[in-house]
Amino acid sequence: LSTDATPTILLCYDGSEHATHAISVTAALFPGATVKVLHVWEPVEHIIARYAVLAPYLGGELIPAADAGAEEQSDSLADEGAKLAKQAGLIATAHSAKLSTTVWEAVVAASTSLGAQLIVTGTRSLSGVHELVVGTLSHSLLQHSELPLLAIPAPLPD
């Protein structure tokens, strides 16, 4: 990171309280920064592949329509995140990315294409078994991204 200027930040946003909190913390740490708010969406084929029993019922022309709906919802979530970021004093644009393999790979690809210098993500407290099986986005980004990562923990309960 350059020390003369505020970095361009890729801010991962999924609509959760954790992601909203990450926007607030980012605004406090980097007032007026340029952020690219990213939501990653999953194509229907990926969902069907996980639940093979659904395949006979969801084929044909339903998949493109469902994907269009998923992409529209993703764009809407990214817009929501960008709006929150702007309200927090950041210079924000909304972006969505179609998942092709894993969420972390989509985030890394977007960080490159959008010229980000820092990735920010909220974190969730997953149980040990859940984290072992599923993993976390922040952990995967730490392992695979060449960019610095700022993982914002969830706020402590009152």
Give the location of each predicted region.
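Glycine-rich, Arg-bearing micro-motifs that act as flexible, cationic patches
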Residues: 118-144, 154, 158
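Solvent-exposed polar/charged
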Residues: 28, 112-113, 143
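Small/aliphatic-rich secondary-structure junction motif
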Residues: 2-63, 90-93
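Structural beta-alpha unit
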Residues: 2-4, 82-119, 157-158
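A short acidic, glycine-rich active-site loop
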Residues: 58-76
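Short, hinge-like loop/turn segments at secondary-structure boundaries
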Residues: 52-56, 111-113, 137-138
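Short, solvent-exposed amphipathic alpha-helices that sit
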Residues: 25, 72-81, 106
